Amino acid sequence: HGNGYNSNNGNGYNSNNGNGYNSNNNGNTNCNFGNCNNANSFNNNGNTNSLNGNNNGNSNNNGNGNNNGNSNNNGNGNNNGNTNNGNSYDSNTNDDSNSIPNAVSVGGSNKLVIKTKSDDSSQTISLLDVFKNYDSNNNGNSNNNGSSYNRNDNGNSYNSNNNGNSYNRNDNGNSYNSNNNGNSYNRNDNGNSYNRNDNGNSYNSNNNGNTNSFNNNGNTNSFNNNGDTNRIDSNSYNSNNNGDNSNTNSVLVPEPTVIVIPAPVQQSVGCVCKPDYDPLLYTDNETYNNKCEAECEGKTVWYDKACY
């Protein structure tokens, strides 16, 4: 669905600004330092300074980069450090025309910010509105229209999920998981793992190593297990399109084949076997592995048609 690695449903490409990872979907979406316009734009940034968030469409902002905090939009509007499940708004604007009546968010120092129209004389705020608009987006976990599970023990973990189920686990390191329209499972135990899944099921497991896995799947199950064992190259790029492909460009080291090459044995001169052992009684095609004691410097030797 696109050109190159990490392109979703169009000509969008990933751009890295510092530790930020930016993915644009659904058409020719242009992004500049987190400015993503043209509907359905998903911007995943970690530790990146951004001028603006995502505008003009269903926007999802994920990580510690854009909009000065962890923000999540599940509707049309702009976010600036707050999370709203529904119609969102800019909590820092001074223009009442851009505000929505009865919109409630949580500000600093446990303050409630109530945005109303300037011509409204009275407002009724319910506790349900408060809880609906409460900022429950922590640790870079963002979910649009689906289930998203994000676990981060010791490191940075950014999980973005749109229209599907995304499971992201990061124990010790940096893990970036972006999932659009499908199921994505990303686990990173010790190292850096980058998992990208567009329109399909992707399973990425990275244990003990710096492994970059870029997986663009079209209705294909790809199982990519990368570590520091049985691999020649620590970087694996797995791209599947409408087929069953497992461990693309991954070279497994086969079990070694043991080949024993015996050292050459010099034949002794003047060795005579005992009289009770007559080699002439055996056929020529029989292998002689019987011991015989020869007069070869008083040593016991093996007999194979000749004394050695």
UniProtKB/Swiss-Prot annotation:
Reported tissue expression: Component of the acid-insoluble organic matrix of the calcified shell.
Location (main, coarse): secreted
Record region (Disordered): 1-21, 47-104, 134-250
Entries under InterPro entries matching the protein: Kazal_dom_sf (IPR036058)
Keywords assigned: Secreted
TM region positions: none
Compositionally skewed regions (Low complexity) per UniProt: 47-99
Cellular localisation: Secreted
Gene Ontology, cellular component aspect: extracellular region
Record's protein name: Insoluble matrix shell protein 4
